[in-house]
Amino acid sequence: MFAAAKVQGINNDGHQRSKRLKTGLKRASGGAIFTAFLGLSLALTSTAVHPEAIIADHRAVQAFERIPAFWLEKAKTMTIHYAHTSHGDQVWQGVSNLESQYPKYRFARRVDATEGLPPAEVPPALRMYDGNPPETYIEPNDYWEGESGKDRTRDVADTGHYHASMWAWCGQVSGASEAYIQGYLDTLYAFETEYPAMRFIYMTGHLDGGGSTGNLHLKNQQIRHYCSANNKVLFDFADIERYDPEGTDFLDLGADDECDYWIGGTKYNWADQWCAAHPGSDFCLSCACSHSRALNCNMKARAFWWMMARLAGWNGQAPSVPLPLILFD
């Protein structure tokens, strides 16, 4: 799934090649230099081609229990860079809550304005660095929008410490234009070509009550279509929010990020209703869940672990046959 790699420089070859490519493209001025770097760019791009899309949506929540033990252990050797604002808290809040229920889902997170993973643990834990120096509250222009933000993300990728990087929207998609979303897609693709040993994880924006005809849904569809057509990794934040654990769809009832929906001018909350109907369910274990209900965070945690198992090499099927894979030492 990943290009053959070792931490601290990707065998001192692949990672350093991508780092030199970035520097060279910025400084190249002659035709021969540009041609040489262009050839290297194409070579690196070819190594970043993946056989299928990985879409972590509400179906991943339902498939979470089917993660084979072998691939769960592989997922716990993974490292991820995560950047976000408050809505993005929901992912790590749910993952931490899941670990409190079931310690086998070991998770370690370090949030700081300086780059760095939490220490390795024994037995292994999936490790996350939360931030994008010099900040931890990361808006578009701190990660992908504008050269300064892009370079901050590159600085983290340049360390060679991470299998993947993910950034979460807040409310920006609700008012976004098609061109704005395309700029986001193009930038993540550029990161992928510069760092072929990493996966850059795409994301949809949280629900806003606009239903299937609203701008948010249309722009989320733009992201989904791109990811499906180009074999990307997508954490489908909005899709997870529109379904309860049994698959009931609330999108066209005005579902929003708080799990509220409307019938006949009356507001309801599907998460509260579901938990009232399923007392004692693991999905309903209380936790801090920014802007939402614990059920929402708990579902996102399950989709996240499913996605990380897929990134570790699981083919999504059970029983699973281990695939050839070289992970970081």
Predicted stretch roles:
Residues 55-155, 310:
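N-terminal carbohydrate-binding/catalytic regions of secreted carbohydrate-active enzymes
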